[in-house]
């Protein structure tokens, strides 16, 4: 593609801890990323498109996911201490907590129950856990492995979704 004329992003308060990602929602472009405490949603010229006033405590290599909640698009990412942060495209945030997660968990998003909304898939040590975005548990299983890696999601069809795990 061509460089965007007028690209002039604001400076972050702290070093960036997530990938800089582009999402297109309802015919609008959103550039999203996070530093240690703030979440940024910019337009394609680097100006703030959505103000997120909440403060977070994020770990390095925070992943940001676009999914749906209640039929509406939202951005989801995890904080320290098992927190799940949900940010909508008006800048409103919701935070829930999943008890019993270490700071070494891995996370992905999957529509576990086929209802069209994202659910959170965690691996933590030898445990696999799926919760709703509000932290309500849907599934949990302990595996024989000592430490599970990132939980990959494979969608073969609308009704055939599988999770791939490594140890």
Predicted regions: what they are:
Residues 1-167:
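Extracytoplasmic/lumenal domain signature
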